[in-house]
Amino acid sequence: MEARNAEGLESCIEKIQEVKLSSFAELKAFRERKVALITGITGQDGSYLAELLLSKGYKVHGIIRRSSSFNTARIEHLYGNPVTHNGSASFSLHYGDMTDSSCLIKLISTIEPTEIYHLAAQSHVKVSFDLPEYTAEVDAVGTLRLLDAIHACRLTEKVRFYQASTSELYGKVQEIPQSELTPFYPRSPYAVAKMYGYWIVVNYREAYKMFACNGILFNHESPRRGETFVTRKITRSVAKISLRQQEHIELGNLSALRDWGHAKEYVEAMWRILQQDTPDDFVIATGKQFSVREFCNLAFAEIGEQLVWEGEGVDEVGKNQDGVVRVKVSPKYYRPTEVETLLGNPAKARKTLGWEPKITVPELVKEMVASDIALMEADPMA
């Protein structure tokens, strides 16, 4: 009897091991497909990430919103490239929206991505004060819809999920620099919505054992940055001034301090986060800080103008060496609640991911100004 029981137990153990090996082999085969789904693919980060993933042999799917005008300028070179957009469908676009859970479920069940990069958001801080409900609907609840779509499609244990979080979570900073352990103190509807997004990712990771991660990205720029963001607004205006298409620029808080990096390097960090053995959250930053005023100095220096600053607050102006006012301050560009300083501590990303930024802020500014000058020369109305 004991021998029979021992044989039965041994057989049972062997079957369990076979199931485990079978499940492991199935998961390995699933991940080796290298299929990525990117929300927000038409944005700055989405376009750079698509380029990176295609270069690594991924099949890339992107979600775009239906609109009356095309908003695909940043990815046209990929969509129109026969190497990336061909019969094997290395690069595909799908209509969808973060406010429509049914379309998200349909896309995920059809595509069965191995990795999802959630970059879509209403990401303009000042606009979030004008559109607080919409910002919450897209940035907060939209993230929940996407996570729940993965769960509904029974892909919880297969898909790896990246959520684009933000340094705006720190808002009224509780310590300098800010790390993964720094308490959050959001100061805008955008930041509050992203805080929900952050914690719902953590919740799904803990509740369903999902490989879900947050990348707390500090400000990152490039020539593809949206025109309403302060860095791009500065470099576009400098380009127009150099071509005598504009006299000066109006800005808000010149003393605001930010940790700026290059978007191309930051999407590399996103990818590395999803290649780890265990899911975790990471601060992605340079660890260096510049003011908006200093960014202006660097940008104008690229066209041979050295700024001298006079006055304080809304009366402050920046004049070039000939005494011509190039920068003015306007109260309309101040936020109802300002975030005065943001400085990230990327030590964890450096140690765990092996990621470290190389492009400096002066190099970034140089690239952005040169790009905008070329753009304005080709089309003064751009």
From Swiss-Prot:
Pfam families in the cross-refs: GDP_Man_Dehyd (PF16363)
Q: Which GO terms describe its molecular function?
A: GDP-mannose 4,6-dehydratase activity
The cofactors required by this protein are:
NADP(+)
Gene3D superfamilies linked: NAD(P)-binding Rossmann-like Domain (3.40.50.720), UDP-galactose 4-epimerase, domain 1 (3.90.25.10)
Q: Which InterPro entries did the record assign?
A: GDP_Man_deHydtase (IPR006368), NAD(P)-bd_dom (IPR016040), NAD(P)-bd_dom_sf (IPR036291)
Keyword vocabulary terms for this entry: Lyase, NADP
What is this enzyme's EC?
4.2.1.47
* Catalysed reactions, semicolon-separated: GDP-alpha-D-mannose = GDP-4-dehydro-alpha-D-rhamnose + H2O
The pathway that the record names for this protein is:
Nucleotide-sugar biosynthesis; GDP-L-fucose biosynthesis via de novo pathway; GDP-L-fucose from GDP-alpha-D-mannose: step 1/2
Cite the binding residues for NADP(+): 40-45, 97-98, 119-123, 134, 194, 220, 225
| Residues annotated as signal peptide | none
Q: What does this protein do?
A: Catalyzes the conversion of GDP-D-mannose to GDP-4-dehydro-6-deoxy-D-mannose.
Q: Name the HAMAP family on file.
A: GDP_Man_dehydratase
Similarity comment: Belongs to the NAD(P)-dependent epimerase/dehydratase family. GDP-mannose 4,6-dehydratase subfamily.
Task: Report the protein name in the record.
Answer: GDP-mannose 4,6 dehydratase 2
Species the sequence originates in: Caenorhabditis elegans
- Organism lineage string: Eukaryota, Metazoa, Ecdysozoa, Nematoda, Chromadorea
What is the primary gene name for this protein? gmd-2
